[in-house]
Amino acid sequence: MSNNCTNTVPRPEVIAALKDWNFAVSVILLFITVLLQWGYPSRCKPIWVIKMFILWLLWPLSIAAAVFAAIHPINSVAFGFAIAFACISGIMWLSYFISSFRLLCRTGSAWSFMPETDMLINIPLLGRTVTRPIISDSPAVQFLIIRGELRFDGFTLGRCDPGDMPDIVTIARPNALHWYKRALTRNMYTRSAILVYIKYKVGNHRVQNTTEDGDRLAMFVA
Protein backbone atom coordinates (compact mmCIF):
# COMPACT_ATOMS: atom_id res chain seq x y z
CA MET A 1 0.00 0.00 0.00
CA SER A 2 1.54 3.28 -1.03
CA ASN A 3 0.77 6.77 0.13
CA ASN A 4 0.47 9.12 -2.83
CA CYS A 5 -0.09 12.19 -0.65
CA THR A 6 2.94 14.50 -0.78
CA ASN A 7 3.45 17.93 0.72
CA THR A 8 4.45 19.92 -2.33
CA VAL A 9 4.01 23.57 -3.19
CA PRO A 10 1.73 24.08 -6.18
CA ARG A 11 3.48 25.28 -9.30
CA PRO A 12 1.36 28.46 -9.65
CA GLU A 13 2.40 29.52 -6.13
CA VAL A 14 6.09 28.99 -6.95
CA ILE A 15 5.79 31.04 -10.14
CA ALA A 16 3.93 33.78 -8.28
CA ALA A 17 6.62 33.89 -5.57
CA LEU A 18 9.34 34.14 -8.22
CA LYS A 19 7.50 36.99 -9.91
CA ASP A 20 7.12 38.82 -6.59
CA TRP A 21 10.75 38.47 -5.47
CA ASN A 22 12.69 38.21 -8.72
CA PHE A 23 13.19 41.97 -9.13
CA ALA A 24 14.18 42.46 -5.48
CA VAL A 25 16.71 39.61 -5.66
CA SER A 26 18.20 40.99 -8.88
CA VAL A 27 18.59 44.45 -7.28
CA ILE A 28 20.28 42.96 -4.21
CA LEU A 29 22.65 40.86 -6.34
CA LEU A 30 23.50 43.89 -8.48
CA PHE A 31 24.19 45.94 -5.34
CA ILE A 32 26.52 43.24 -3.94
CA THR A 33 28.31 42.93 -7.30
CA VAL A 34 28.89 46.69 -7.51
CA LEU A 35 30.21 46.77 -3.93
CA LEU A 36 32.63 43.90 -4.50
CA GLN A 37 33.87 45.11 -7.89
CA TRP A 38 33.98 48.89 -7.41
CA GLY A 39 34.28 49.27 -3.63
CA TYR A 40 37.92 50.37 -3.62
CA PRO A 41 39.37 53.86 -3.01
CA SER A 42 41.24 53.67 -6.31
CA ARG A 43 38.00 53.06 -8.26
CA CYS A 44 35.03 54.77 -6.62
CA LYS A 45 35.38 56.34 -3.18
CA PRO A 46 31.61 56.82 -2.50
CA ILE A 47 30.95 53.11 -3.13
CA TRP A 48 33.98 52.25 -0.99
CA VAL A 49 32.56 54.35 1.88
CA ILE A 50 29.23 52.50 1.59
CA LYS A 51 31.11 49.19 1.63
CA MET A 52 32.97 50.18 4.83
CA PHE A 53 29.70 51.28 6.47
CA ILE A 54 28.10 47.91 5.68
CA LEU A 55 31.12 46.09 7.11
CA TRP A 56 30.71 48.07 10.34
CA LEU A 57 27.04 47.04 10.54
CA LEU A 58 27.58 43.33 9.88
CA TRP A 59 29.02 42.50 13.32
CA PRO A 60 26.17 43.96 15.44
CA LEU A 61 23.58 42.60 13.01
CA SER A 62 25.07 39.09 13.18
CA ILE A 63 25.16 39.26 16.99
CA ALA A 64 21.55 40.48 17.11
CA ALA A 65 20.42 37.71 14.76
CA ALA A 66 22.20 35.04 16.82
CA VAL A 67 20.72 36.37 20.08
CA PHE A 68 17.23 36.44 18.54
CA ALA A 69 17.70 32.84 17.36
CA ALA A 70 18.73 31.85 20.90
CA ILE A 71 15.69 33.58 22.45
CA HIS A 72 13.31 31.96 19.95
CA PRO A 73 15.00 28.63 19.07
CA ILE A 74 13.53 26.11 16.67
CA ASN A 75 14.87 23.22 18.77
CA SER A 76 17.66 22.46 21.25
CA VAL A 77 20.26 21.96 18.51
CA ALA A 78 19.46 25.33 16.95
CA PHE A 79 19.62 26.89 20.43
CA GLY A 80 23.15 25.52 20.95
CA PHE A 81 24.37 26.77 17.57
CA ALA A 82 22.78 30.19 18.18
CA ILE A 83 24.58 30.56 21.53
CA ALA A 84 27.88 29.47 19.95
CA PHE A 85 27.56 31.88 17.03
CA ALA A 86 26.58 34.74 19.35
CA CYS A 87 29.65 34.12 21.52
CA ILE A 88 31.98 33.83 18.51
CA SER A 89 30.60 37.01 16.94
CA GLY A 90 30.85 38.90 20.23
CA ILE A 91 34.46 37.80 20.82
CA MET A 92 35.50 38.75 17.27
CA TRP A 93 33.74 42.14 17.53
CA LEU A 94 35.43 42.80 20.89
CA SER A 95 38.79 41.82 19.39
CA TYR A 96 38.22 44.29 16.55
CA PHE A 97 37.53 47.13 19.01
CA ILE A 98 40.56 46.28 21.16
CA SER A 99 42.86 46.29 18.12
CA SER A 100 41.28 49.50 16.83
CA PHE A 101 41.72 51.32 20.15
CA ARG A 102 45.35 50.18 20.41
CA LEU A 103 45.97 51.46 16.90
CA LEU A 104 44.16 54.71 17.75
CA CYS A 105 46.38 55.22 20.81
CA ARG A 106 49.46 54.55 18.69
CA THR A 107 48.58 56.87 15.80
CA GLY A 108 45.86 59.22 17.02
CA SER A 109 43.98 58.74 13.74
CA ALA A 110 40.30 57.91 13.24
CA TRP A 111 41.40 55.62 10.41
CA SER A 112 42.21 53.14 13.21
CA PHE A 113 38.56 51.98 13.10
CA MET A 114 38.83 50.99 9.44
CA PRO A 115 37.21 47.50 9.35
CA GLU A 116 39.13 46.35 6.28
CA THR A 117 42.65 46.46 7.76
CA ASP A 118 44.64 46.99 10.97
CA MET A 119 47.58 48.82 9.35
CA LEU A 120 48.02 52.58 8.89
CA ILE A 121 50.78 54.30 6.94
CA ASN A 122 52.03 57.62 8.35
CA ILE A 123 53.80 60.18 6.15
CA PRO A 124 55.33 63.34 7.69
CA LEU A 125 54.57 65.89 5.00
CA LEU A 126 55.06 69.67 5.10
CA GLY A 127 54.58 70.10 8.84
CA ARG A 128 51.83 67.54 9.32
CA THR A 129 51.44 63.78 9.40
CA VAL A 130 49.19 62.21 6.78
CA THR A 131 47.71 58.87 7.85
CA ARG A 132 45.89 56.45 5.57
CA PRO A 133 44.97 52.73 5.70
CA ILE A 134 47.11 50.18 3.91
CA ILE A 135 45.77 46.73 3.05
CA SER A 136 48.82 44.49 2.62
CA ASP A 137 52.04 44.15 4.61
CA SER A 138 54.98 44.56 2.25
CA PRO A 139 58.77 44.99 2.64
CA ALA A 140 58.53 48.02 0.32
CA VAL A 141 56.00 50.79 -0.34
CA GLN A 142 55.79 53.06 -3.36
CA PHE A 143 54.56 56.63 -3.75
CA LEU A 144 53.74 58.43 -6.97
CA ILE A 145 53.92 62.19 -7.45
CA ILE A 146 52.22 63.47 -10.61
CA ARG A 147 52.50 67.20 -11.30
CA GLY A 148 52.88 67.93 -7.60
CA GLU A 149 50.04 65.64 -6.45
CA LEU A 150 51.06 62.84 -4.07
CA ARG A 151 49.24 59.53 -4.54
CA PHE A 152 49.40 56.24 -2.68
CA ASP A 153 47.28 53.11 -3.05
CA GLY A 154 44.31 54.94 -4.55
CA PHE A 155 44.45 57.87 -2.12
CA THR A 156 45.42 61.44 -2.99
CA LEU A 157 47.46 62.62 -0.01
CA GLY A 158 48.03 66.25 -0.94
CA ARG A 159 50.32 68.44 -3.01
CA CYS A 160 54.10 68.41 -2.68
CA ASP A 161 57.32 68.29 -4.68
CA PRO A 162 59.59 65.23 -4.76
CA GLY A 163 62.06 67.08 -2.54
CA ASP A 164 59.40 67.55 0.14
CA MET A 165 59.04 63.82 0.77
CA PRO A 166 60.53 62.59 4.08
CA ASP A 167 63.38 60.13 4.40
CA ILE A 168 61.36 57.94 6.78
CA VAL A 169 57.72 56.80 6.75
CA THR A 170 56.11 54.39 9.19
CA ILE A 171 53.39 51.75 9.13
CA ALA A 172 51.58 51.30 12.44
CA ARG A 173 49.94 48.11 13.62
CA PRO A 174 48.25 47.47 16.98
CA ASN A 175 51.33 45.65 18.30
CA ALA A 176 54.25 47.29 16.45
CA LEU A 177 55.54 50.19 14.40
CA HIS A 178 57.43 49.51 11.14
CA TRP A 179 59.98 51.98 9.80
CA TYR A 180 60.58 52.42 6.07
CA LYS A 181 63.58 54.31 4.68
CA ARG A 182 63.63 55.99 1.27
CA ALA A 183 65.68 53.81 -1.07
CA LEU A 184 64.86 55.15 -4.54
CA THR A 185 63.71 58.42 -6.09
CA ARG A 186 63.12 58.37 -9.82
CA ASN A 187 62.27 61.80 -11.25
CA MET A 188 60.15 61.60 -14.39
CA TYR A 189 59.24 65.14 -15.46
CA THR A 190 58.22 68.45 -13.89
CA ARG A 191 57.18 67.90 -10.25
CA SER A 192 56.67 64.18 -10.91
CA ALA A 193 58.53 61.22 -9.46
CA ILE A 194 58.33 57.65 -8.18
CA LEU A 195 59.60 57.04 -4.64
CA VAL A 196 60.25 53.64 -3.08
CA TYR A 197 60.69 53.04 0.66
CA ILE A 198 62.20 49.84 2.11
CA LYS A 199 61.44 48.43 5.56
CA TYR A 200 64.51 48.52 7.78
CA LYS A 201 63.34 48.07 11.39
CA VAL A 202 60.39 47.22 13.61
CA GLY A 203 59.76 48.51 17.12
CA ASN A 204 57.20 49.22 19.80
CA HIS A 205 56.90 53.01 19.58
CA ARG A 206 54.41 55.83 19.12
CA VAL A 207 53.79 57.72 15.91
CA GLN A 208 54.93 61.33 16.12
CA ASN A 209 52.20 63.49 14.62
CA THR A 210 53.45 66.93 13.62
CA THR A 211 50.99 69.70 12.86
CA GLU A 212 51.22 73.39 12.08
CA ASP A 213 50.43 74.18 15.73
CA GLY A 214 53.27 72.06 17.08
CA ASP A 215 54.21 68.50 17.88
CA ARG A 216 51.73 66.04 19.31
CA LEU A 217 52.47 62.50 20.42
CA ALA A 218 49.77 59.86 20.27
CA MET A 219 49.55 57.93 23.53
CA PHE A 220 50.35 54.24 23.28
CA VAL A 221 48.64 51.53 25.26
CA ALA A 222 50.77 48.40 25.44
Swiss-Prot record:
The chain crosses the membrane at residues 21-41, 52-72, 81-101. InterPro entries: M_batCoV_HKU9-like (IPR044360), M_CoV (IPR002574). GO terms for molecular function: structural constituent of virion. GO terms for cellular component: host cell Golgi membrane; membrane; viral envelope; virion membrane. Its main location: virion. It is a multi-pass membrane protein. It is found in: Virion membrane; Host Golgi apparatus membrane. Keywords: Glycoprotein, Host Golgi apparatus, Host membrane, Host-virus interaction, Membrane, Transmembrane, Transmembrane helix, Viral envelope protein, Viral immunoevasion, Viral matrix protein, Virion. Residues 42-51, 102-222 are intravirion. It comes from the Viruses. Residues 1-20, 73-80 are virion surface. Homomultimer. Interacts with envelope E protein in the budding compartment of the host cell, which is located between endoplasmic reticulum and the Golgi complex. Forms a complex with HE and S proteins. Interacts with nucleocapsid N protein. This interaction probably participates in RNA packaging into the virus. Belongs to the betacoronaviruses M protein family. Component of the viral envelope that plays a central role in virus morphogenesis and assembly via its interactions with other viral proteins. This is Membrane protein. It comes from Bat coronavirus HKU9.
